[in-house]
Amino acid sequence: MNGYRPSSSQHACQQNPSPDAGTASARLSRRSFLIAGAGALVGAAGRVRADAPIILGQVSLSFYAVAGAVVHEILERMGHTVELRQGPHDEIFPMLGDSAIDLMAACWLPEGHAAYWAKYGGNAMEVARLYDGARFFWAVPDYVPASEVASIADLAKPAVAQRMTKVIQGIGTAAVITTVSQKAVGEYGLDSLGYSLRPGKPAEWTGAYDAAVAEGRWIVFPTWAPQYLNRGGKLRPLQDPRGILGGVNHASLVAPRGRFQALPATTRAVLARIDLGLDGVTEMDWLVNVGKKTPREAARLWMQANDGRVSGWFR
């Protein structure tokens, strides 16, 4: 090997072996056997890990579900079995921290999920940047004049406060948009004017918006991008001069470092290339909430329409 040739003295030892040489040879054979056996065990362990189900965690909101569905589809195309874990933020992030899942879709950084990441992301890593431009904001329906309501601060104007629905419907208490919206109510002095934030289920949140629009009623709507209601241009974002709701984020597919490194190299490489874009997630979210597709169906439709982009992930 590597151009090595035994010397004549070595040949002589091989032709006339001494008892010591025989003992050494036996030791060498035993050592080779052990090394080969260990290699076989490592190979078997690698095959077992490659064949084991991949556990995908995601927050149970539709825009996370469609991003997760694309990851799910990609993994199945590569021959993996996928087990899905869904729940609110305060259930899924601890699973990431405990290495109880292989992947999680998705984490907003650097600000959106900063507190969760600081608490549960110490042994985790960003796998792929799924989309940029993610942000939280408050909005009003487009029929509310911008000349009267352009920023969150304008909600305190007497004429605006008189017309605006005072109950601001939010989503679950563990969601970051709920936390920052509650802070905004206080920071902008809206609580003293009768405004209040009411956490609820996603259906209650969208239901409050739909009911207000149907009645032409003024309403403030805490929301985010990507989200399907942004697709029609019927929501107008409000400025946040105090910066309470935070800045722009990117959303990443994340994973416990050890569990991700245990995945096959090809799988890791393909996952790292996934790029959905803000518009892609918005479109899939619209297919779920308006088109009444399942997240998996929405993911397949979007992937078919963007076949060239998806094929590039497998290059």
Indicate residue ranges for each PLM-predicted region.
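C-terminal functional modules
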Residues: 278, 283-288, 295-315
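Short, well-ordered beta-strand elements
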Residues: 51-63, 80-85, 165-169, 271
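Short helix-initiation/N-cap motifs at beta->coil->alpha
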Residues: 61-62, 83-95, 196-208
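Pocket-flanking alpha-helical
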Residues: 68, 87-123, 208, 227-234
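N-terminal secretory signal peptides
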Residues: 1-28, 35-43
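A bilobed periplasmic-binding-protein/Venus flytrap-type ligand-binding module shared by bacterial periplasmic
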Residues: 136-146, 249-263
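Ligand-binding pocket segment of bilobal, Venus flytrap-like solute-binding proteins
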Residues: 101-105, 173-243
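A conserved helix-loop-strand patch within extracytoplasmic ligand-binding domains
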Residues: 123-172
